[in-house]
């Protein structure tokens, strides 16, 4: 490499001699057979030691390793690792460790036929395992688009996972970052359940000085330093687990003091991305969310906050909405060809609104209390308005439908009244009457701009699905 500096040197180094080829021979890229062999055999301590020894010598060497799970000289990946969590756990390590990840022929498709260099054609008529391919699309490929976070070693930190005073050698834990993007990876390469804490990284070598004054120092960083967190009671760390899509929140100060806790089932892997720190708001929402969630994840922190703030409102809304929506759906979508008369429909609507009166009054009273200083009609008045609107909608929907015009927009502009407008629009939106019935339930709040604040659209979707 010194004699021909512009040459890229690639090596296929087996028998666990990768370090020799990189350190002594100066190869730029080397097949890392230790990755495949040790992880396949679950020799986890050996492989963790190899990583720790490498970063103690020179972390930059990790960038030169080509990590793989199979190649033309080895059995296929599915033959060695299967198609379940162990395969995807090791594959996650492969694409999130520094270095160059390499997929073998047919690995993603789950092919089982081994191809040597002498093969000129396939002898098995194999088809891709679509479930395996789909899981790659969900678990693996999105992380590959984030390779800029994982590929380099400048911010790579490797951790021991401590549990009851000892290190669990079966869990791989490391963090990395690029710019303001951070990630933490955990994988338990054993069937047994495992848990523990990470706080301080394993030591790694750093070259300091220049010229003849260059020397190597051993350094270590905490997970809080690796994620650039603050030792502040008012700061919170928010992150997303890639595979499940769950969001988590932790106190930044707690991570600084204790580190990060992880509990993994056998062969379970978790990748935390979109890690960022926030300062608590005046209403202490992040503190309340952190205390309420108690470490568990949720799919949307904003929705979780809404559910906490509007718990009583949503309970009264659910009691009202679930008592009327199924009945309204039945009225607007009759299962028989025999259409009821207007008088019969009025009778059905009256029976429905009478049956839900208590739930309706309770909802409108509760919602008015939540509205605070917004001027709104009294609960009884809103209930009466709802009954009138619902009757009008049901009767309108029962009329002979309008013929769909060639130009709907032009026809809407020419509509002579509200009823004509609705009937014309319904030719392109069959669900319109049910949507308007929902509007009838919350009309006063929608008109006052409260429906969006209280996320009623989301709540209605829960009851329609």
Pin down the residues of each PLM region.
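Carbohydrate-interacting/catalytic domains
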Residues: 3-5, 23-31, 35-57, 63, ...
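Active-site beta-loop-alpha junctions enriched in small/polar residues
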Residues: 12-16, 71, 108
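Active-site neighborhood of glycoside hydrolase catalytic domains
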Residues: 1-18
